[in-house]
């Protein structure tokens, strides 16, 4: 029989450059990867930022692909791979949030192209070997070490233009990684320490970002926390919360970070009685008496959404969402019961505070 002291910890290889102004080190880091021709991936909205990256690369810049979008549609992934091949690229730089990093991973999955990530949100995808592609309205995820970025540049200056409401939602999305990591079936003490510190840093930084989006100290706290929470996501398994969010995002096209923000308090309340130590750690990190209610209040008090209905979810789709979420068995500290899950989704739809969800 294993004791709580028995665990397996596998470090993930990644080079991290952190600090205000660290984008200045970009060309050095591309050289460090041995790359000669780098493409830059971005969303249409971040084309100007991608152009700045290309300008910094000089002759090493091979082109910009600006069609990254939520949930990585299969047709976009294929188009981006073809673009990389046509440019003769030997490196892809993903600048932006989880959508852009996700597109980089989709390219790396079949080409083994090294990825250099420059996050401008708190999504944390850059720290994980997890990829996802949406095909026919179904988001399919997997794990492959080839998709883990080789280098990550964290520059808090690049996050100051992220709208405050989206910043808070993106930060709580990051907290979700650490929160579920604390009760993962393969949790270990190393990741649990990192998870609690990541949650603490984000809970400290996000209210400061809400007060002043240009506060670099608050932005640094939030980005530091997001890095740590991303490490947790990349090292231990996830459970009900992430399954629900993948269902809502991939099948109903809800925005990623905001969906995590709405669902997290309810998923924690669902699992609370089956993961008491994790709940104590989360509550301690955010300075609250109750983990689920504390995260609900963190979102609400700082201008983030707390209801699925404001994200575009239709009440008539809640039954289908519950069916999809229980279609394929997965580990969770509490058995996933369809009726209780349907009640959870109703509360999340309405924006009601989390409660104990019984069958």
For the regions a protein language model found, what residue spans apply to each?
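C-terminal charged capping/lid subdomain of soluble metabolic enzymes
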Residues: 285-359
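Structural motif
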Residues: 15, 37-39, 63, 90-93, ...
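ATP/NTP phosphate-donor binding region
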Residues: 1-90, 308
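A glycine/threonine-rich phosphate-anchoring loop and its flanking beta-alpha core
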Residues: 14, 24, 28, 109-193, ...
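A short, small-residue-rich loop immediately preceding and capping a beta-strand
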Residues: 84-107, 111-122, 244
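Active-site segments that bind and position negatively charged phosphate/pyrophosphate groups
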Residues: 181, 185-294
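Short glycine/serine/threonine-rich phosphate/pyrophosphate-binding segments
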Residues: 23-26, 46-50, 74, 99-106, ...
């Amino acid at each position: 029989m294993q004791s709580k002291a028995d665990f397996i910890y596998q470090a993930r290889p990644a080079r991290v450059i952190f600090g205000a102004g660290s984008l200045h080190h970009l060309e050095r880091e591309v050289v460090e990867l041995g790359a000669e021709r780098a493409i830059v991936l971005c969303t249409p909205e971040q084309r100007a930022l991608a152009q700045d990256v290309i300008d910094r690369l000089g002759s090493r810049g091979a082109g910009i692909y600006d069609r990254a979008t939520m949930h990585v549609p299969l047709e976009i992934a294929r188009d981006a791979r073809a673009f990389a091949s046509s440019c003769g690229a030997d490196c892809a730089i993903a600048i932006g949030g989880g959508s852009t990093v996700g597109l980089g991973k989709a390219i790396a999955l079949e080409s083994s192209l090294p990825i250099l990530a420059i996050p401008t949100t708190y999504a944390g995808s850059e720290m994980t070997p997890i990829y996802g592609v949406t095909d026919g309205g179904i988001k399919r995820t997997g794990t492959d070490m080839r998709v883990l970025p080789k280098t990550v540049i964290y520059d808090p200056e690049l996050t100051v233009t992220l709208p405050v409401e989206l910043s808070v939602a993106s930060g709580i999305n990051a907290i979700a990684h650490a929160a579920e990591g604390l009760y993962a079936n393969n949790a270990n003490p190393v990741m649990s320490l990192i998870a609690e510190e990541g949650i603490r840093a984000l809970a400290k930084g996000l209210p400061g970002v809400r007060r002043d989006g240009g506060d670099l100290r608050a932005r640094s706290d939030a980005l530091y926390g997001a890095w740590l929470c991303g490490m947790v996501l990349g090292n231990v398994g996830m459970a009900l919360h992430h399954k629900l969010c993948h269902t809502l995002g991939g099948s109903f096209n809800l925005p990623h970070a905001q969906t995590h923000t709405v669902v997290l308090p309810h998923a924690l309340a669902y699992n609370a009685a089956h993961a008491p130590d994790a709940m104590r750690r989360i509550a301690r990190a955010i300075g609250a008496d109750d983990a689920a209610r504390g995260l609900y209040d963190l979102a609400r008090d700082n201008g983030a959404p707390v209801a699925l209905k404001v994200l575009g979810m239709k009440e008539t789709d809640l039954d289908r969402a519950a069916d999809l979420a229980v279609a394929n068995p997965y580990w969770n500290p509490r058995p996933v019961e369809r009726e209780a899950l349907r009640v959870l989704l109703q509360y999340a739809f309405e924006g009601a505070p989390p409660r104990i969800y019984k069958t």
